[in-house]
From Swiss-Prot:
Similarity field: Belongs to the universal ribosomal protein uL16 family.
GO MF term set: structural constituent of ribosome
HAMAP family: Ribosomal_uL16_arch
Gene that encodes the chain: rpl10e
Full protein name: Large ribosomal subunit protein uL16
Entry-linked Pfam families: Ribosomal_L16 (PF00252)
Record-linked NCBIfam families: PRK04199.1-1 (NF003236), PRK04199.1-4 (NF003239)
């Protein structure tokens, strides 16, 4: 079955489902690296991608945002001239009660009986004002970092904004 759209998992109304000892098949974390670029660089500007509403961000969306921002920054600024961090981790396990949509499906499936669902993916639960991504650059590369975070924000299902600060 194909993956459901991200809007199906954007909001949450249930407690987090994170206890892996109770889950028979836990889905893998699809984000291979959370820190990219030059972590030891001495940069004077920090740009943060902050969400404005509470919600869930699927690991697929976080990975797409990370790849897009990293590719743009590597091409425009260079690998040694930025540091990018994904600041949230997808702890929450997403479940889906799979349903058939065909003729005679009512004879083959149980409907809402035992409808807890099976694990299909992971998501990060975020609150309003929480940092999702962080980019450190020099002052001359602020415009490129803003564009990279703007492109990353288009992959995230929640409204967000970019905050620019001077590094301490």
């Amino acid at each position: 079955m194909p993956l459901r759209p991200g809007r199906c998992y954007r909001h949450f109304g249930t407690p987090p489902y994170t206890r892996l000892e109770y889950i028979k098949s836990n889905p893998p974390v699809l984000i291979p690296k959370f820190d990219l670029g030059n972590p030891k660089g001495n940069f004077n500007t920090v740009l943060k991608l902050v969400v404005m509403r509470p919600g869930q961000i699927r690991a697929n969306a976080l990975e797409a945002a990370r790849q897009h921002a990293n590719k743009y920054l590597t091409a425009k600024v260079g690998e040694a001239n930025f540091f990018l961090r994904v600041a949230v981790f997808p702890h929450h396990i997403l479940r889906e009660n799979k349903m058939m949509a065909m003729a005679g499906a009512d004879r083959l499936q149980d409907g809402m009986r035992l409808s807890f669902g099976t694990p299909v993916g992971r998501a990060a639960r975020v609150e309003a004002g929480q940092i999702v991504m962080l980019v450190k650059v020099d002052a001359k590369n602020i415009d490129h970092a803003k564009e990279a975070l703007r492109r990353a924000a288009s992959k995230i299902p929640l409204p967000s904004r970019i905050i620019v600060e001077q590094a301490q």
